[in-house]
């Protein structure tokens, strides 16, 4: 058995004060995201999305954050996937971004909605050709007989669409509309900085939490 008890890091890079935080948590998220990109953090847009299905059981997976706007956080996926089925019956999610190199994480909770078909079309058209083919070939989360069947299907779709690939109707974007956003900065002695924003009567309330 692997001994994990003594695997730990001491956090000491930066501090996070209320004065440093923007009044708008989405702008604060953009600021931290930009700093992660500038620091060349590995996969700075990778975020864990947790959902809960009708059976009450949670599931989570890492997806790529593709946009932060005034409403929330946007990601794209197959609507028939496990997360898509979860969101169809329980349209809420918890999201986490972790930037180990900066000793930071951001936690988001909120309602999830599909974005407009037009916005999904626009993003889909920007994807590499092979990724667009893959969106048609993959019945995400479905059991398949083997890898060859997937590759054969992709080849058939590529032959059918050698140039332009339309967006599959079952593929598109979601937006997580935050009700809570927490910013975490690792600090010495595990006395971390935690600044939480929560939505109250349409206004953001900012508060410090005990680590």
Curated annotation (Swiss-Prot):
A GO biological-process term: pyridoxine biosynthetic process
Residues given in the record as FMN binding sites: 61-66, 76-77, 83, 105, 140-141, 184, 194
InterPro entries: Pyridox_Oxase (IPR000659), Pyridox_Oxase_CS (IPR019740), Pyridox_Oxase_N (IPR011576), Pyridoxamine_oxidase_dimer_C (IPR019576), Split_barrel_FMN-bd (IPR012349)
Class of the enzyme per the UniProt entry, highest EC level: oxidoreductase
Pathways per UniProt: Cofactor metabolism; pyridoxal 5'-phosphate salvage; pyridoxal 5'-phosphate from pyridoxamine 5'-phosphate: step 1/1; Cofactor metabolism; pyridoxal 5'-phosphate salvage; pyridoxal 5'-phosphate from pyridoxine 5'-phosphate: step 1/1
Binding-site residues for substrate, renumbered to this chain: 8-11, 66, 123, 127, 131, 190-192
This protein's UniProt keywords: Flavoprotein, FMN, Oxidoreductase, Pyridoxine biosynthesis
UniProt keyword Flavoprotein present: yes
Domain of life: Bacteria
Its EC number(s): 1.4.3.5
Cofactor annotation comment: Binds 1 FMN per subunit.
HAMAP family, A to Z: PdxH (MF_01629)
Family recorded in the similarity comment: Belongs to the pyridoxamine 5'-phosphate oxidase family.
Protein name (Swiss-Prot/TrEMBL): Pyridoxine/pyridoxamine 5'-phosphate oxidase
Organism of this sequence: Mannheimia succiniciproducens (strain KCTC 0769BP / MBEL55E)
């Amino acid at each position: 058995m692997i001994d994990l008890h003594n695997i730990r890091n001491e956090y000491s890079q930066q501090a996070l004060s209320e004065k440093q935080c923007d009044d708008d948590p989405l702008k604060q998220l953009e600021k931290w995201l930009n700093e992660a990109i500038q620091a060349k953090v590995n996969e700075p847009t990778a975020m864990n999305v947790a959902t809960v299905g009708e059976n009450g059981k949670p599931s989570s997976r890492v997806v790529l954050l593709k946009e932060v706007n005034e409403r929330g956080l946007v990601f794209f996926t197959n609507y028939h996937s496990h997360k898509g089925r979860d969101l169809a019956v329980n349209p809420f999610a918890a999201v986490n971004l972790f930037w180990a190199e900066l000793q930071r994480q951001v936690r988001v909770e909120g309602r999830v909605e599909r974005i407009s078909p037009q916005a999904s079309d626009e993003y889909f058209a920007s994807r590499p050709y092979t990724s667009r083919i893959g969106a048609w070939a993959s019945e995400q989360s479905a059991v398949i007989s083997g890898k060859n069947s997937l590759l054969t299907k992709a080849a058939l779709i590529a032959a059918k669409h050698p140039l332009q690939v339309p967006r599959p109707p079952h593929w598109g974007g979601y937006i997580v509309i935050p009700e809570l956003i927490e910013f975490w900065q690792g600090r010495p002695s595990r006395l971390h900085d935690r600044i939480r924003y929560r939505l109250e009567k349409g206004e953001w309330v900012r508060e410090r939490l005990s680590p």
